[in-house]
Amino acid sequence: MKRIAAELGVSVTTVSKVLNHHADIGPATRARVLARVEELGYRPNAVARSLTLRRTHTLGVIIPDLMHSFFVEVVAGLEAIVSARGYGLLLCASGEDPKKERVALDMLRARQVDGMVLASATATSNTALLRDIAAQGTALVMIDRDDHPRVRCHRVLTDDVKVGRLATAHLVAAGRRAIAHIKGPPIAHSRRREQGYRDALAAARLRVREDRLVEGGFMEADGYRAMQALISLTPRVDGVFAVNDPAAVGAMKAIWDAGLRVPDDVSVVGAGDVAYSDLIRVPLTTVRWSKRDLGGRAAELILDQMDAGTTDRPRRVIIPPELIVRESA
């Protein structure tokens, strides 16, 4: 850095700020420094830099599934923002397993990442660990799932009650009256989507039959099993709101395997608008919210927190949902 500074007639501090993506350097100076850095093939020593700055310029991200298209889009939105500020991502998958989540949290803490973004595993028991991480000053943002209410951190979510209301109200508007709900695991956003389902039925003056609420899960196989149970009810259900799109797709397969038609016999609505929702035999009506915005807003919050060095006022950012009408309902 001293050589570059001397050649360009700027201070070593200026060169350092350019390399560390500080915003208080003018564009002309930044361009000159970066051009000379490129000419010299200069690469900062990451270990030395982290020791000097007390930052690793790495963020840890824990999501339930690295292959799930929903979370792929969330991470893409996150990465687009943080990479522009010189941060890299260290990705971990919990597999919806609290033990794996704990191992990932401990590993990220040992790696001294500057911050963590977490979509919590179902049935997680890691509240105490997360409170400890936040209390030690590691920037923490929770996305998509609103669990661990006692953990002081920013959160980026959708309005899950509205998700349930939009989906169920659409089934009511389509003339369906025996409307079932395939529930998710017992975590906050599943419960809120169920509440939206109940609210929409109440608004339509339709009675909630508890046998039409079947606990499923977030995967296709969960939706398939739940729908098999619902098909056996009398009178037969004529509409289904599934907690997410994979569960809805599984439900549709169970309907077809029973010799019934979607939407003629049973209408189906999902939630999440995953990548293949409009590519299946009967394109899926669903409720959508921007996954890239979810990741992007999480990135902005965690960068702001790291710059400020505190979370005096934890924020809840809500990404609004919207109904996407296709052919399944």
Where on the chain are the PLM-derived regions?
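Active-site-adjacent beta->alpha loops and helix N-cap segments on the catalytic face
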Residues: 124-134
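Short beta->alpha connector loops
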Residues: 95-98, 121-124, 246
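Bacterial carbohydrate/catabolite-sensing allosteric modules
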Residues: 39, 80-85, 109, 134-329
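Amphipathic helical "hinge" segments at domain boundaries
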Residues: 27, 31, 40-118, 181, ...
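Short beta-strand segments enriched in small/hydrophobic residues
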Residues: 7, 12-17, 52-67, 170, ...
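Residues at alpha-helix caps and immediate loop-helix transition turns in enzyme cores, especially N-
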Residues: 29, 70-74, 101, 129, ...
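N-terminal helix-turn-helix DNA-binding module of bacterial transcription factors
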Residues: 1-57, 329
